[in-house]
Amino acid sequence: MEDSTTKNIKEIYLAGGCFWGIEAYAKKIYGVIETTAGYANGKTENTTYRELHSTDHAETVHIKYDADKLSLKKLLKFYFQVIDPTSINKQGNDRGRQYRTGIYYTNPKDREIILQEISEQQKKYTDKIQVEVEPLKNY
């Protein structure tokens, strides 16, 4: 991971199965400054691992990145390399709603970039991409 001396720090939240795998992968990407594993976009503001089934949060990684070194588009291309975007509520051996795929944004301008990348990725699959795209509600 890079140091955080840059002024152009952006953030995105990525859900893609167990958060430990996504986090470990993201840490190796040039331009990523910081990663944090947590739970996002559930029915309640906060949750715990034991409450996941009732609160409907997704295991998610908060990624801060230097936009001068790494674009959101490029970061999303890396993300799509390590998930199965056509599966619903599962990745690999991990099964359940908490393992769903999702891209959660805090900057409304990111939505268009995300949807463009999904459209681009869809060309690689016959099945429909099932990745949630939503504003971040909670983390």
Where are these regions (language model features)?
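Flexible coil/turn and secondary-structure edge motifs
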Residues: M1-Y139
